[in-house]
Amino acid sequence: MMKPKYERILIKLSGEALAGERGVGIDLKTVQEMAKEIQEVAESGIQIALVIGGGNLWRGEPAAEAGMDRVQADYTGMLGTVMNALVMADSLKQLGVDTRVQTAIAMQSVAEPYIRGRALRHLEKGRIVIFGAGIGSPYFSTDTTAALRAAEIEADAILMAKNGVDGVYNADPKKDANAVKFNELTHREVISRGLKIMDATASTLSMDNDIDLVVFNMNEPGNIKRVVFGEPIGTTVSNSSEEK
């Protein structure tokens, strides 16, 4: 069997990815299909953590722009990420995958509190860990949550699963037919070019902690496994020089 390129990964899913074609809410069939993809990777012995956004249920910034207190709006969004985490955890458990949800805001009736040592223990035992409620503080995105948790659990890579986009381009490929895809980039290039893969805080965290970032199309079955085993798909962002 091929040796995996990455042995411990954190998968970042957007909330919208759980919504299916509707674009809002949670489409259970879509979540179940994603869970199946993740299960196949877990069965290869890969240690997996997940961070899921909440944009399918709530967005804090537009709510704040409409007059809602920004802190309250962000906390509302954090609760949305917990809803997504619980649904994904249930879908994984129904496939026989041992899964734990840990939240940055304590809610003992539905999830464990986030404790780094416990999360590491779960991963070492082959359990999938889903991190919910962001980092527990307003003004921080789920991209930043993904970068922070990846650093804390010493993940080899963050897999940015994108909806219908197969990597990073120099322009929006949906609007510009001449857009060119990057196969490799450095974290510093992403920041200096202002490429919107993650927000600046998340990009800097990934760079400072030497965590690879792989951006790929999650709609293609088997792509998570392909990334883990080193197939050249999507765009890989790392601290390595482009000239290897």
From Swiss-Prot:
Disulfide feature: none
Binding site for UMP: 54, 74, 135-142
Primary site of residence: cytoplasm
Subcellular localization, as worded in the UniProt entry: Cytoplasm
Record's keyword annotation contains Cell inner membrane: no
Alphabetized InterPro entries for the sequence: AceGlu_kinase-like_sf, Asp/Glu/Uridylate_kinase, Uridylate_kinase, Uridylate_kinase_bac
Similarity comment: family membership: Belongs to the UMP kinase family.
Protein name: Uridylate kinase
Source species of the chain: Streptococcus suis (strain 05ZYH33)
Gene field: pyrH
